[in-house]
Amino acid sequence: MTDILKKIEAYKRDEIAVAKHARPLGEIEAAARAAPRVRPFAGAIATSLAEGRTALIAEIKKASPSKGLIRADFDPPALARAYQRGGATCLSVLTDTPSFQGAPEFLGSARAAVDLPVLRKDFMYDTYQVAEARAWGADCILIIMAGVDDLLARDLADAAAAYGMDAIVEVHDDAELERALDLPCRLIGINNRNLRTFETSLETSERLAPRVPKDRIAIGESGIFTPQDVARLAKVGIGTILVGESLMRQEDVASATSQLLAV
């Protein structure tokens, strides 16, 4: 685990402890069961792919640790609608505050503005967070293999499945991919960002995608800026992409989204 992930895990575990005290597990589980019906996340992606379209998971992200503030004019419902108009298949919404200036209410308000499935993009270290995600309206969670052991990864995946949610299992090297394929999750995210240097390279996706079985869906994450990047990933069988920063920086998000997908 990188030093960055260790620092993140430390503050996330503090956050989780505070959240559990403020809202006990039984209460958050009840809220999760009462939340709006789950929208099929993997199902929406599979439909886009079956129709021959690139499946875009469009990310609503205000800031990042490496780039600082990305979008000052930050209106999650408006951004969600722009992404939907531009042809996005799903949304990803950052809910981590210290590193990304995200918030739970961003997820809820974005989801309410559209009919797209939504990923809670956050660092998950406890099944409490899965119940939290469902209570906030999330349809999918993220499991980052670089930050969790196999037992916790399995617990998170099982907790998501119990709520009818999907999980993206994120990897960035061969060893993590091998571990991810042991989980009963259809979505395999390949992060092109090196978690040690924060540099991005599409070569990571090009190297790992051929090892993803045909019954799984490979997702290219990070470092995707142009239709040429999208086409490059398509050559290795990646038809699903997660894009945030490059679209968040555009004045006309809907137009930029449709242009990215014009391949």
Swiss-Prot record:
Coiled-coil stretches noted in the UniProt entry, renumbered to this chain: none
Keywords: Amino-acid biosynthesis, Aromatic amino acid biosynthesis, Decarboxylase, Lyase, Tryptophan biosynthesis
Transmembrane segments: none
Main EC class the enzyme belongs to: lyase
Pathway in which the depicted protein is active: Amino-acid biosynthesis; L-tryptophan biosynthesis; L-tryptophan from chorismate: step 4/5
GO molecular function: indole-3-glycerol-phosphate synthase activity; phosphoribosylanthranilate isomerase activity
EC number: 4.1.1.48
SUPFAM superfamilies, sorted: Ribulose-phoshate binding barrel
GO biological process: L-tryptophan biosynthetic process
Catalytic activity: 1-(2-carboxyphenylamino)-1-deoxy-D-ribulose 5-phosphate + H(+) = (1S,2R)-1-C-(indol-3-yl)glycerol 3-phosphate + CO2 + H2O
Residues making up the signal peptide according to the UniProt record: none
NCBIfam families listed in its UniProt record: PRK00278.1-2 (NF001370), PRK00278.1-6 (NF001373), PRK00278.2-4 (NF001377)
Membership in a protein family: Belongs to the TrpC family.
Identification of the protein by name: Indole-3-glycerol phosphate synthase
